[in-house]
Amino acid sequence: MFKSTDPQIKNEILKKTQSEFILAGHCGIPFYEELSEGIWFNTGVIGMPANDGQTSTWYLELTENQNFKPVYHKLSYDFELASNKMIQENLPSEYAKTLTTGVWDNCDVLPEREAKAQGQSLNI
């Protein structure tokens, strides 16, 4: 599920699950969207840059005090060390490179809008 996914699809899922909000992850690109049936939060993924050309990753903070308004934070870490350890452990070199460049080696899983935004800073 991505920001560009048809809002009707997200609304159908919210309605079907009888949820006020859905908190999802793993798509790799964080976003927040208020819809007619509820709110969709996507945290991104903590272990991989968001294909935005930045070596930092993202995480989402939600508290009741904020009335469940999202606060997205960048997480900086020693990406060179992490990349080198991945290489030492014979993990996929494409992922190790992504840690140092902030862009994914391919965009096959992305809808067109997100694929075209590769390397662009996120505004969330």
Model-derived segments and their meaning:
Residues 1-21:
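Conserved catalytic scaffold of divalent metal-dependent phosphoesterases
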Residues 34-124:
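Acidic, His/Gly-rich catalytic cores of divalent-metal-dependent hydrolytic chemistry
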Residues 20-28, 40-44:
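Active-site neighborhood of phospho(di)ester-bond hydrolases with catalytic His/Asp-centered motifs
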